[in-house]
Amino acid sequence: MAIAEWRQQLANGEVSARELTDHHLARIEAVEPGIHAFLEVTAERARADADRVDEARASGEDLPPLAGIPLAIKDNLCTRGVRTTCSSRMLEQFVPPYESTVTERLWAAGAVLLGKTNLDEFAMGGSTETSAFGPTANPWNPEHVPGGSSGGSAAAVASGECLASIGSDTGGSIRQPASFCGVVGLKPTYGRISRYGLVAFASSLDQVGPFSHSVADAAELLQVMAGADPRDSTCLNAPVPDYCAALGRPVEGLKVGLVKECFEQEGLDPQVKASVLAAAQQLQALGADLVDVSCPRFNDGIATYYVIAPSEASANLARYDGVKYGYRAEDAASLAAMTARSRAEGFGSEVQRRILIGTYALSAGYVDAYYKKAQQVRTLIRRDFDAAFQSVDVLLTPTAPGTAFRNGAHADDPLAMYLSDLLTIPANLAGLPAISVPCGFDTGGLPIGVQLIGNVLEEPLLLQVAHQFEQAADVMKTRPEAAFIPG
């Protein structure tokens, strides 16, 4: 059921928040040995949160919009009093003394914290295999990855361990795992949701967003999380519209642009292409006009991203030196040796690789050739999107070139791993909102996602189109097999 339906049942007393929470905690206990979506399950807190909701309802109080709704939070969002590790040995014992703006707003809306979810270390990866605490399995097939970096959050929703979850998206880290796990994943406009309390990877690209079973649930969560925040100077001071009100509007007469560069990709799986084109035809059947558009520099996005993102990561991760907090190497001969050893032992290989790439790109002899040039190309990519939106309302592409790949398939080939974000990265570079919605399955039964991209702050239109497609296509009648439940 959708969040709105659960809210109604909770308000009517048909189900209690405690019962809903206990159901999901039991589900977590049953399937976690096979999925490993969670790094920490906060069962005691969840039950206490739920009991407070039930007490408020019993006393006749008006319940906030997410009262009693069990959520999971990606473990790179600070939660006061609950460990926030970023799936790294560097922060294995870090307990934040403050709350992120996102989680603060969710708790104020009555949401229940079930726990913190697994991710690629410091959100750097596309499979959740770089986590220092072990990989997460794809609920549709445990021999395949759930995507990344927010693989734990996606898998938790897909396997029914929570009603919805929160992730972060720097180059596709919400949309790609949403596609791989057969759930909805929304990356809002850059600055639409505060990043205060989000552990930084690449500050000009990072954005928080929801995973859910439906577009309507994504709209509900966005409604709570969006809005200005004086603690984040990049957060937009723009009015927050009623996102749910847009869902029922028809798509008739809207222009949907098919980005030709995306459908001409050499590595695009034919099954993915066919499924996504069928999704476009579904929108056409609903009255939308399909228009072929070109974004000539779309394919330059991945090279641009892998200069800018590692450069920002190199600067952001310089703070982890073993002095004030985080992992500290023992018995070092000097401060310099302690810092060097702490970083070498605390960071995994993928994080170290990206720090080195970024440090190189920012070095005195190469900053003009790499970093500044990448920023110039980023501007050109944004201009391509601006030109496209002169003639269409939303853009449509595959979310990923293929379906979820096998565990370990790209372990020795980081470039192949990076290519899984080929189709999602440009929206991050341009700061645009984008959503992945399930649109079908491959012959192996793995989900396929279609990506819709909107113009800046056009989340209402994006959600409108996504919801209308979702309702018409109804591809997600099935859920992952309960293969991990004992007995």
From Swiss-Prot:
Its EC number is 6.3.5.7. GO terms for cellular component: glutamyl-tRNA(Gln) amidotransferase complex. The keyword Protein biosynthesis applies. The active site is at residues 74, 149, 173. GO terms for molecular function: ATP binding; glutaminyl-tRNA synthase (glutamine-hydrolyzing) activity. It catalyses: L-glutamyl-tRNA(Gln) + L-glutamine + ATP + H2O = L-glutaminyl-tRNA(Gln) + L-glutamate + ADP + phosphate + H(+). Disulfide bonds: none annotated. Pfam families: Amidase. PROSITE patterns: AMIDASES. One of its GO terms (biological process) is translation. Keywords: ATP-binding, Ligase, Nucleotide-binding, Protein biosynthesis. It comes from the Bacteria. Heterotrimer of A, B and C subunits. NCBIfam families: gatA. Belongs to the amidase family. GatA subfamily. Allows the formation of correctly charged Gln-tRNA(Gln) through the transamidation of misacylated Glu-tRNA(Gln) in organisms which lack glutaminyl-tRNA synthetase. The reaction takes place in the presence of glutamine and ATP through an activated gamma-phospho-Glu-tRNA(Gln). This is Glutamyl-tRNA(Gln) amidotransferase subunit A. It comes from Synechococcus sp. (strain WH7803). The gene is gatA.
